[in-house]
Design a protein with these regions (language model features):
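Feature captures hydrophobic
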Residues: 1-107
Length: 107
């Protein structure tokens, strides 16, 4: 799976029930060979992917392409990646804690 393919799957694994009443934008800045920016916007529980990102996300995750794919494939725990500096988080940390429930098959 490529980085782009992993993001294209996000709307399919998004859990609208976990986002009920939520209006937030999450953004991922991916570095490395498959570098790119993707945002996922949630408005009143409905989500959509925004390739290229947005100007002012509520939270930004920065991670290498290889580590991102390892996280999405379940080979690297996101919390462990954060604690070891492989995954950087800026913005709403409470929102970061909700990501596993928003995207249950994304790790």
């Amino acid at each position: 799976m490529t980085v782009a393919e992993s993001f294209e799957q996000m709307p399919n694994v998004f859990n609208p029930a976990a986002a009920a009443g939520m209006t937030k934008t999450l953004q991922w800045n991916i570095t490395g060979e498959e570098a790119g920016v993707w945002a996922f916007q949630i408005i009143n529980g409905e989500g959509k992917l925004i390739p290229g990102g947005v100007e002012k996300p509520d939270i930004t995750f920065t991670v290498s392409d290889k580590d991102w794919l390892s996280i999405t494939e379940g080979k690297l725990d996101a919390m462990n990646a954060f604690m070891t500096g492989k995954l950087k988080v800026a913005g709403d940390m409470m929102l970061a804690m909700k990501v596993p429930s928003l995207f249950p098959t994304q790790r």
